[in-house]
Amino acid sequence: MIPRWQPASIPLLLHLDTLRCHHVSVQPPRATMTSLNIKEEDIPRLDGKVVVISGGASGIGLAAANIFARAGAKIFLFDCNPPDSGEAPENSTFIKADITSWAELKAAFAQAGHVDIAVANAGVSEEQPYFEDTFDEQGELKEPGFAVVDVNFKGTVMFTKLAVSYMRKQGKGGSVVITASATGYAPEQNLPVYSAIKSGLVGLVRSLRSTLPRFDISINAVAPAATITKLLPMDIAGPLMAAGLPVSSAHMVGLAVVYSAVARQPRMVETYGKENVLDLESKWNGRTILTLGEHYTELEEKLADLRPVWFGWRNTDLTKKQQATADFR
């Protein structure tokens, strides 16, 4: 059974009469907050499907790999180091690959040979306080490191490009899921560059969600808040939990990743360009699931519905007309 989204709606009181410009053709927003109830038993069988996961040897990537494997999929784990002994599912293959290397990523995809689901999960945290001055031996302002940019953004874009290329050539569609972050929506002041990059990954999903469905390819993101992984070990997560603040397990986030790859939706997030049918049943596409503790929330549909409120009714209308004029599809 393919899981289908069932919204839990919380109405927002919007004074639309004071916001609407009468000459604008945009429709009133459907202002709802959407909670999701995701259970592993709702994940359909994936026998014969091939899943590739970057950063798949630990944390969220490995948790997702185990869920995919229990559903019958064949897994390829792309990472710099193999999983710890006994942690990887039996029907998985580890491929050593640096996500910042185009050559290594190409070779990893070639070794996998076929791709039905691709999870761009590899990521690192910010390696230093970017906007504090540090100096070299000559006392000159030192250039900062860019591993967080290369891994989290460049690597994700390259991984996504290769996945989409394989799926298009295969002609059977597919699903791409990107591990973004809650900081992409609510920036963390101690991680300014990391937060900005994660916002960029959400932007990548938004930019591709109207074009990839032409090839029966969906693209979605998962935005984890505090999650127990190597980036947030238990000695740091413990005080958050002791304070009663929500912290997710890697399994909770991994389940959101798998759901994003296989679920279906009763309507699109939004129309783009020449599109005029919103209520179209299709693959789960162009969405982001926030994981906060044990709670899942889909973020993108509400943001899109409320665009006339925060972007402006006139601005929304004229921008959509510009998009329709330039729509190359």
Swiss-Prot record:
Gene Ontology MF terms: oxidoreductase activity
Gene (UniProt): prx4
Catalytic residues of the enzyme: Y194 (proton acceptor), K198 (lowers pka of active site tyr)
UniProt cross-references to Pfam families, sorted A to Z: adh_short
Keywords: Glycoprotein, Membrane, NADP, Oxidoreductase, Transmembrane, Transmembrane helix
Sugar attachment sites: N91
Organism for this UniProt entry: Penicillium roqueforti
The UniProt record lists the keyword Phosphoprotein: no
Membrane-related topology note: Single-pass membrane protein
Known pathway: Sesquiterpene biosynthesis
Highest taxon listed in the record's lineage: Eukaryota
Family: Belongs to the short-chain dehydrogenases/reductases (SDR) family.
Function noted in UniProt: Short-chain dehydrogenase/reductase; part of the gene cluster that mediates the biosynthesis of PR-toxin, a bicyclic sesquiterpene belonging to the eremophilane class and acting as a mycotoxin. The first step of the pathway is catalyzed by the aristolochene synthase which performs the cyclization of trans,trans-farnesyl diphosphate (FPP) to the bicyclic sesquiterpene aristolochene. Following the formation of aristolochene, the non-oxygenated aristolochene is converted to the trioxygenated intermediate eremofortin B, via 7-epi-neopetasone.
UniProt EC number: 1.1.99.-
UniProt-listed InterPro entries: NAD(P)-bd_dom_sf, SDR_fam
Subcellular localization, as worded in the UniProt entry: Membrane
Transmembrane segments: 238-258
Knockout consequences: Reduces the production of PR-toxin and leads to a large increase in mycophenolic acid production.
Predominant place of localization: membrane
Entry GO terms, CC: membrane
Protein name: Short-chain dehydrogenase/reductase prx4
Top-rank EC class of the record's enzyme: oxidoreductase
Positions annotated to bind NADP(+): S58, I60, N81, D98, N121, K161, Y194, K198, T229
